[in-house]
């Protein structure tokens, strides 16, 4: 994934946590906030040490990055998205992680082919 699509700075993570919206399922927690001044989405990944050793954490991050790469054309631009992996992801393969991620993004209206969530309220 290109560097311009990544969130790396701690301040950006913290700002997304404080000012953004969140939603979750058993496997993933997603925080997001809209940034109208950017023309593409950016992602930040967090996999804690409770998940497993470095090999396990890196495998989960690779799966999440690959899932975003495959979903890239469908994700709405101008969002910062932070994903936190939970413990059940250690037993999932990449296909299951992608399915869980795409379901959450669809549910929250962050995919282009979904209706805006605010129009449902």
From Swiss-Prot:
Top-level enzyme category: hydrolase
One cellular component (GO) term of this entry: ribonuclease P complex
GO biological process, one term: tRNA 5'-leader removal
The reaction(s) this protein catalyses: Endonucleolytic cleavage of RNA, removing 5'-extranucleotides from tRNA precursor
EC number, as in UniProt: 3.1.26.5
PROSITE patterns per UniProt: RIBONUCLEASE_P
Cysteine pairings via disulfide bonds: none
GO molecular function: 3'-tRNA processing endoribonuclease activity; ribonuclease P activity; tRNA binding
Source taxon at top rank: Bacteria
SUPFAM superfamilies assigned: Ribosomal protein S5 domain 2-like
UniProtKB keywords: Endonuclease, Hydrolase, Nuclease, RNA-binding, tRNA processing
Subunit structure: Consists of a catalytic RNA component (M1 or rnpB) and a protein subunit.
Family: Belongs to the RnpA family.
Function, in words: RNaseP catalyzes the removal of the 5'-leader sequence from pre-tRNA to produce the mature 5'-terminus. It can also cleave other RNA substrates such as 4.5S RNA. The protein component plays an auxiliary but essential role in vivo by binding to the 5'-leader sequence and broadening the substrate specificity of the ribozyme.
PANTHER family in UniProt: RIBONUCLEASE P PROTEIN COMPONENT
Descriptive protein name: Ribonuclease P protein component
